[in-house]
Amino acid sequence: MSFDRQQVPAWRPGYRFQYEPAQKGHVLLYPEGMIKLNDSAGLIGGLIDGQRSVAAIIDELQQQFPGVPEVADDIEQFMEVARAEHWITLA
C-alpha cells in the first residue's frame, strides 16, 4: 500500500505541538497527558500546519538535510504512526 503524499496533515482538536524547555524538546500536549517527541518527530511536527501536504513537508526537510536519503520514508512513517495514534488527521 502506498502513502498518498498529497494529503494534508493537521493536529486533531485538543492536541497542541510545542517546544517545552523543561523537557528540552518538542512535545505533543493533549487532555490526558503529554508525549515527548524525538528530534526527528519534532522537526516534522513543526511543519504540520493544516496547509502543507506531506509532499511539501518532505520537500522542505529534504532541502534541510540533502544527504539523508531516508527522509521521505521517515516522514511517511511518522504520519502513519501519528494517524494511528489519532494525533493528526490527513485530508
UniProtKB/Swiss-Prot annotation:
Q: Under which pathway is this protein filed?
A: Cofactor biosynthesis; pyrroloquinoline quinone biosynthesis
Q: Which UniProt keywords apply?
A: PQQ biosynthesis
Is Iron included in the keywords of this UniProt record?
A: no
Query: What is the superkingdom listed in this entry's lineage?
Result: Bacteria
Q: Which GO terms describe its molecular function?
A: quinone binding
Q: Which Pfam families match?
A: PqqD
BP GO terms, sorted: pyrroloquinoline quinone biosynthetic process
Query: Per its UniProt record, what InterPro entries does this chain match?
Result: PQQD (IPR008792), PqqD_bac (IPR022479), PqqD_sf (IPR041881)
Gene3D superfamilies noted in UniProt: Coenzyme PQQ synthesis protein D (PqqD)
Summarize the protein's role.
Functions as a PqqA binding protein and presents PqqA to PqqE, in the pyrroloquinoline quinone (PQQ) biosynthetic pathway.
The subunit field of the Swiss-Prot or TrEMBL record says: Monomer. Interacts with PqqE.
Similarity comment: Belongs to the PqqD family.
| Protein known as | PqqA binding protein
- Name the source organism: Pseudomonas entomophila (strain L48)
- Gene name per UniProt: pqqD
